[in-house]
């Protein structure tokens, strides 16, 4: 009688769904008010002129205009601003 011993069980085999974080609108792109610019965990990028910060640290445009990324301040922080068109 052909027989195969049962394989053992494993404790692996699961992974979390990706959260699609990152920059959604890059420097120089034009955006409308309310457009999401960056999705992030924590403030990797800080809000500058005409940019709002959501409760999950999402950065969004408050006005229509062009996206501008810059590094400034004593701690070399990244900021994103909207230059009104």
Curated annotation (Swiss-Prot):
- Name of a matching Pfam family: Ribosomal_L27
Q: Does the keyword ATP-binding apply?
A: no
User: Which residues are connected by disulfide bridges in this protein?
Assistant: none
The name under which this protein is listed is Large ribosomal subunit protein bL27
- From which domain of life does this come? Bacteria
Q: Which GO terms describe its molecular function?
A: structural constituent of ribosome
Which family does the record claim for this protein? Answer: Belongs to the bacterial ribosomal protein bL27 family.
Organism listed in the record: Saccharophagus degradans (strain 2-40 / ATCC 43961 / DSM 17024)
Q: What is the lineage of its organism?
A: Bacteria, Pseudomonadati, Pseudomonadota, Gammaproteobacteria, Cellvibrionales
Keyword 4Fe-4S in the entry? The reply is no
Q: Which GO terms describe its biological process?
A: translation
In the UniProt record, what gene is named as encoding this protein? rpmA
Disordered: annotated span: 1-26
Q: Which GO terms describe its cellular component?
A: cytosolic large ribosomal subunit
> Any idea which UniProt keywords this protein has?
Ribonucleoprotein, Ribosomal protein
């Amino acid at each position: 009688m052909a027989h195969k011993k049962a394989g053992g069980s494993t404790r692996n085999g699961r992974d979390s769904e990706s959260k699609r974080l990152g920059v959604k609108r890059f420097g120089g792109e034009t955006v409308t008010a309310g457009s999401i610019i960056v999705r992030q965990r924590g403030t990797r990028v800080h809000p500058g002129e005409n940019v709002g910060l959501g409760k999950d640290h999402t950065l969004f445009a408050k006005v229509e205009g062009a996206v501008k990324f810059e590094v400034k301040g004593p701690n070399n922080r990244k900021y994103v601003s909207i230059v009104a068109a």
